[in-house]
Amino acid sequence: MSQLKNDRYLRALLREPVDYTPVWMMRQAGRYLPEYKATRAQAGDFMSLCRNAELACEVTLQPLRRYDLDAAILFSDILTVPDAMGLGLSFGAGEGPKFARPVENAAMVENLPIPDPETELQYVMNAVRTIRRELQGEVPLIGFSGSPWTLATYMVEGGSSKAFTKIKKMMYADPQTLHKLLDKVSDAVILYLNAQIKAGAQAVMIFDTWGGVLAHRDYPDFSLQYMQKIVAGLIRENDGRKVPITLFTKGGGLWLEQIANSGCDAVGVDWTVNLAEAKAKIGHKVALQGNMDPSVLYARPARIRQEVRSILADFGNGSGHVFNLGHGIHQDVPVENPKIFVDAVHEYSKAYHK
């Protein structure tokens, strides 16, 4: 593999010195880019795009051609794992994901297979290998998965949800079945992420998009303990380098100390979290990633720069901060605005790394 030319992202995750704060954006390969829309049209539909290694590589690299980003993230979807477990994933035009065979009871959990990442999910590993080759060591490649709780919400609800009544019914009325499901999904995710690391992912991130819908006493049992199980099962060194792990629970500000004790290297935070307070609580133990509200990217350039300055000031001096949005970039953001954002992070952060 090519020697890494820009390893600031990996160094910041390990709280090692950097000369400026590295930055990337969740969903940086996506619908706000006209070239992404063109490639997706060429693929035919979303899952065909994910399953074509060359096209998945192309959309992964597109934002790096426009913006001076410090990391690439694999173009894929968190639902590849439950899809490979036989739930029948589909994306209707303009609709969210749907599963033809949602998980409804203990017998269905029992019958779920744990997919082999190099057979049922080989298309993801092929994409990782292709992207690593094409990146030529410019920036690190991030692999990822959904968290067991977040994946289980889709598997039980049969798709996206606003109220999460089906999975919460299972959680309160039949917790044993839900724990069995979460345990099985954790095993599948460990295999999946380790396969991504072996294929060339240099860091991994676990997206716990729906952890924040849990009651404060349920989160450790139904979300965090399973992410902790994954962290304990992951390959932590590859190619002679540490493979850093970031956990991101949207709405997870209540549980920062517990997340930081999970064994991860970095904790992602959304825009509801005060970065200065988060650093004071857990910055001695883990790096922090975040946390600009993605809607700031609708603003005028001066307002974007002002927000970048404020967040950098919140974190203050030293390494251990990866600048990012607090969630994915919105699909109708003006395409020139991420450049203003990324360049501002690089320019204004240098003063904090002397």
UniProtKB/Swiss-Prot annotation:
Compartments it resides in: Cytoplasm
Enzyme's top EC category: lyase
EC number(s) recorded for this UniProt protein: 4.1.1.37
CDD domains: URO-D
Molecular function terms from GO: uroporphyrinogen decarboxylase activity
Family statement: Belongs to the uroporphyrinogen decarboxylase family.
A biological process from GO: protoporphyrinogen IX biosynthetic process from glutamate
Biological function: Catalyzes the decarboxylation of four acetate groups of uroporphyrinogen-III to yield coproporphyrinogen-III.
Reactions catalysed: uroporphyrinogen III + 4 H(+) = coproporphyrinogen III + 4 CO2
Binding site for substrate: R27, Q28, A29, G30, R31, D77, Y154, T209, H327
Source superkingdom: Bacteria
Protein known as: Uroporphyrinogen decarboxylase
Pathway the protein takes part in: Porphyrin-containing compound metabolism; protoporphyrin-IX biosynthesis; coproporphyrinogen-III from 5-aminolevulinate: step 4/4
Keyword Endoplasmic reticulum recorded: no
InterPro entries in the cross-refs: UROD/MetE-like_sf, Uroporphyrinogen_deCO2ase_HemE, Uroporphyrinogen_deCOase
GO annotation, cellular component aspect: cytosol
Keyword match Cytoplasm: yes
Transition state stabilizer (site feature) positions: D77
